[in-house]
């Protein structure tokens, strides 16, 4: 029983992987050392572009 649960866990982790750097806008954001957020940017950050094909915001620190 333990082995079957472990195999199911490994299989589910393998099938549901998320590759975050697949989009061109996401790669540009990460290369500029900015951070992608699906919701609003944090308090001391501004939105400079988009990530994940326009679904998220690329946020840059203000200081």
UniProtKB/Swiss-Prot annotation:
Gene Ontology molecular functions: CCR6 chemokine receptor binding
Disulfide bonds: 29-58, 36-51, 41-59
One record GO biological process: defense response to Gram-negative bacterium
Location in or out of the cell: Secreted
Gene Ontology cellular component annotations, sorted alphabetically: extracellular space
Alphabetized Pfam families for the sequence: Defensin_beta
UniProt cross-references to InterPro entries, sorted A to Z: Defensin_beta-like
Coiled coil: none
Record-linked SUPFAM superfamilies: Defensin-like
Signal peptide stretch: 1-21
Main location: secreted
UniProt keyword annotations, A-Z: Antibiotic, Antimicrobial, Defensin, Disulfide bond, Secreted, Signal
Biological role stated in the UniProt entry: Has antibacterial activity.
Family: Belongs to the beta-defensin family.
Name the record gives this protein: Beta-defensin 38
Originating species: Rattus norvegicus
